[in-house]
């Protein structure tokens, strides 16, 4: 797919802006705090319905205004399409071509893509929640049923935790039944995704770092990867029953996909403790390239967008050159940087946007 244009109104520091993009490289450059990241943020909102910096829509509204509006024109499978996204006070509206979309789940996959940000090193250094989110976002873009089960599991988990805190066992069985049904699907899909990502991530890690160390991914869950959905469900039911009395005392659920983790290692050693920052960032980049590749394969051959905020941050010149080399084969690319000459040596169709340009 190709993002042809983007229109912003009262979004962050943009009163109004209209941009037409190159089908290959788009370099957004300028001093810090001038709105470079905001442009990627707007595209990300159109991709998955929220910013990668906040989940609170009012934060995205320009000061002294009550709403923001985004509109994208894009080509998908050769057909020009339009996506509009607006928020006013408490009301969110999404319109795809001329059809209103009732939920964010209907938005997912319309504009597939990945983004790498400076904070993404926390993907390998930070909490398990970030790694679960990494898996959830990419699976949700290609599997609507996953979104259904993710929402269903979250609702049932919230209700079960409430009953645990209230020490009410009367209706807890029905919520556990709903939980385990959806949890089994989530766990199985995460295992399948990681199996697919493993070889891709290893390949990209070598290409991006030049190192031959083995990058390994391991999903850590109560259930094993070789179990069927029914077997996972039975195992979860057994575990919930086993833990119920203890969970009544502490007021929350101890096991399930909301507690699982993705373990990442280089050369068999935990990347959190035994890798340099350069290795960690190359690993994160490799995971996102693998994510892009999977979205491409699962998306009927469409090329997802690839965005990098503050490209080259904390990378040495070798890793930076290797990163740019790989970007030349991923379709449409959006990069932010303070260096307007960053792509001077690239022989490709490119467009440079120099900020500020909105005054």
Swiss-Prot record:
<dbReference type="InterPro" id="IPR003395">
    <property type="entry name" value="RecF/RecN/SMC_N"/>
</dbReference>
<keyword id="KW-0238">DNA-binding</keyword>
<dbReference type="GO" id="GO:0000731">
    <property type="term" value="P:DNA synthesis involved in DNA repair"/>
</dbReference>
<keyword id="KW-0227">DNA damage</keyword>
<comment type="function">
    <text>The RecF protein is involved in DNA metabolism; it is required for DNA replication and normal SOS inducibility. RecF binds preferentially to single-stranded, linear DNA. It also seems to bind ATP.</text>
</comment>
<keyword id="KW-0963">Cytoplasm</keyword>
<dbReference type="GO" id="GO:0003697">
    <property type="term" value="F:single-stranded DNA binding"/>
</dbReference>
<dbReference type="GO" id="GO:0005524">
    <property type="term" value="F:ATP binding"/>
</dbReference>
<dbReference type="GO" id="GO:0009432">
    <property type="term" value="P:SOS response"/>
</dbReference>
<keyword id="KW-0234">DNA repair</keyword>
<protein>
    <recommendedName>
        <fullName>DNA replication and repair protein RecF</fullName>
    </recommendedName>
</protein>
<dbReference type="Pfam" id="PF02463">
    <property type="entry name" value="SMC_N"/>
</dbReference>
<dbReference type="GO" id="GO:0006302">
    <property type="term" value="P:double-strand break repair"/>
</dbReference>
<dbReference type="InterPro" id="IPR001238">
    <property type="entry name" value="DNA-binding_RecF"/>
</dbReference>
<dbReference type="InterPro" id="IPR027417">
    <property type="entry name" value="P-loop_NTPase"/>
</dbReference>
<feature type="binding site">
    <location>
        <begin position="30"/>
        <end position="37"/>
    </location>
    <ligand>
        <name>ATP</name>
    </ligand>
</feature>
<keyword id="KW-0235">DNA replication</keyword>
<keyword id="KW-0547">Nucleotide-binding</keyword>
<dbReference type="GO" id="GO:0006260">
    <property type="term" value="P:DNA replication"/>
</dbReference>
<comment type="similarity">
    <text>Belongs to the RecF family.</text>
</comment>
<dbReference type="GO" id="GO:0005737">
    <property type="term" value="C:cytoplasm"/>
</dbReference>
<keyword id="KW-0067">ATP-binding</keyword>
<dbReference type="InterPro" id="IPR042174">
    <property type="entry name" value="RecF_2"/>
</dbReference>
<keyword id="KW-0742">SOS response</keyword>
<dbReference type="InterPro" id="IPR018078">
    <property type="entry name" value="DNA-binding_RecF_CS"/>
</dbReference>
């Amino acid at each position: 797919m190709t993002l042809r244009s983007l229109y912003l109104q009262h979004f962050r520091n943009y009163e109004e802006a209209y941009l037409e993009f190159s089908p290959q490289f788009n370099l957004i450059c300028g001093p810090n705090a001038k709105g470079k990241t905001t442009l990627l943020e707007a595209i990300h909102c159109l991709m998955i319905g929220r910013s990668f910096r906040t989940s609170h829509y009012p934060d995205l509204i320009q000061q002294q205004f009550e709403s923001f509006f985004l509109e994208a024109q894009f080509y998908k499978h050769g057909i020009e399409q339009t996506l509009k996204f607006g928020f006013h006070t408490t009301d969110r509206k999404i319109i795809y071509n001329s059809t209103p979309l009732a939920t964010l789940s209907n938005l997912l996959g319309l504009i597939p893509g990945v983004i790498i940000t400076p904070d993404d090193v926390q993907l390998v250094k930070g909490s398990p929640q970030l790694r679960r989110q990494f898996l959830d976002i990419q699976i949700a873009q290609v599997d609507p049923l996953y979104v259904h089960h993710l929402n269903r599991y979250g609702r049932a988990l919230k209700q079960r935790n409430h009953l645990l805190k209230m020490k009410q066992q009367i209706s807890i069985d029905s919520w556990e039944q709903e939980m385990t049904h959806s949890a089994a699907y989530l766990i199985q899909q995460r295992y399948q995704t990681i199996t697919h990502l493993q070889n891709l991530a290893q390949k990209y890690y070598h290409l991006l770092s030049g190192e031959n160390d083995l990058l390994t991914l391991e999903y850590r869950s109560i259930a094993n990867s070789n179990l069927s959905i029914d077997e996972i469900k039975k195992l979860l039911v057994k575990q919930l029953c086993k833990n119920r009395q203890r969970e009544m005392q502490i007021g929350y659920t101890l096991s399930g996909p909301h507690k699982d983790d993705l373990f990442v290692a280089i050369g068999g050693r935990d990347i959190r403790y035994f890798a340099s920052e350069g290795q960690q960032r190359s690993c994160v980049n490799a995971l996102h390239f693998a994510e892009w590749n999977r979205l491409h394969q699962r998306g009927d051959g469409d090329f997802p967008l690839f965005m990098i905020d503050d490209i080259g941050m904390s990378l040495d010149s070798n890793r930076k050159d290797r990163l740019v080399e790989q970007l030349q084969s991923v379709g449409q690319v959006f990069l932010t940087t303070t260096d307007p000459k960053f792509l001077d040596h690239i022989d490709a169709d490119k467009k440079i946007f120099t900020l500020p340009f909105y005054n």
